[in-house]
Amino acid sequence: MSIKKRKPTINSQRQYSVDDKEDITTTDPERSLLEPLPNSGGRNNQGRMTMRYRGGGHKRRYRKIDFKRRDKDGIPATVKTIEYDPNRSARISLLAYADGEKRYIITPDGLEVGDTVMNGPQAQAEVGNCLPLTSIPLGTKVHCVEMTPEKGAQMVRAAGTHAQLTAREGDYATLELPSGETRLVPSKCRATVGTTSNVEHENVVLGKAGRKRWLGRRPRTRGVAMNPIDHPMGGGEGLKSGGHPRSREGVPAKGYKTRKRNKESNKYIIRRRTESKQGTGGQ
């Protein structure tokens, strides 16, 4: 996969870039693995807005992804397709198991149509195979990592990401996450070998407001442009800075730690995420 840029014939094309999607083999998803995906528009079940600046966007259908892969131990599966999923940044692959069942998984980088993947403790530590952390050699790059055994993959699922297995001691394994955080995970948890696909995703520049609307994101109003009743940074005569940057709820925006001091999972964190790898906001 590579990034394509447009000629700056108009301003909206000047910074515009898009991936060429050469790795996608079909545009027809497996119908048996599709579900309706209603658009909430940022509202909860009472109709009240709980997330601002959401709504619109292209209609989607949810692809059911197998994040557990535990009930197919020892059954080989063949990769039939590599597909685009509008609900996530990574590609997905359709697996056809030897028993006739079909399932989607997140595609690892380097996996191709026709390859065979396996699940379970007896599987080899090869790209696309899902194994317990006890069966994976130290130093291996993994993705789709469970945090609780049998709960399914919860970490390292975005495009172009991987965690590295650095140590094992007792009932826990040590993982270095993409954020820079070093964390303990139960050794019985499973992970998939390799790096997630679509590694160039971070280099895509939306380039224009319309592409953001296609994704279901509405324009975001600055706090300093609001009235003081609507935002702590609002009000003032003329152009004002708004004072110390903070959210609508008054939480400081620069360097203020929002994680609970006595959170139960603190004991599993060996080293907090590094400042250089913390996000700086969306595009």
UniProtKB/Swiss-Prot annotation:
Subunit record text: Part of the 50S ribosomal subunit. Forms a bridge to the 30S subunit in the 70S ribosome.
Coiled coil: none
Protein name from the UniProt record: Large ribosomal subunit protein uL2
Pfam families xref list: Ribosomal_L2, Ribosomal_L2_C
Annotated function: One of the primary rRNA binding proteins. Required for association of the 30S and 50S subunits to form the 70S ribosome, for tRNA binding and peptide bond formation. It has been suggested to have peptidyltransferase activity; this is somewhat controversial. Makes several contacts with the 16S rRNA in the 70S ribosome.
Keyword check for Membrane: no
GO molecular function: rRNA binding; structural constituent of ribosome; transferase activity
Region of interest: Disordered: 1-59, 222-283
Gene3D superfamilies reported in the protein's UniProt record: 2.30.30.30, Nucleic acid-binding proteins, Ribosomal protein L2, domain 3
UniProt cross-references to SMART domains, sorted A to Z: Ribosomal_L2 (SM01383), Ribosomal_L2_C (SM01382)
Keywords on record: Ribonucleoprotein, Ribosomal protein, RNA-binding, rRNA-binding
GO terms, biological process: cytoplasmic translation
One cellular-component annotation, GO: large ribosomal subunit
Family (UniProt): Belongs to the universal ribosomal protein uL2 family.
Alphabetical list of InterPro entries matching this protein: NA-bd_OB-fold (IPR012340), Rib_uL2_dom2 (IPR014722), Ribosomal_uL2 (IPR002171), Ribosomal_uL2_bac/org-type (IPR005880), Ribosomal_uL2_C (IPR022669), Ribosomal_uL2_CS (IPR022671), Ribosomal_uL2_dom3 (IPR014726), Ribosomal_uL2_RNA-bd_dom (IPR022666)
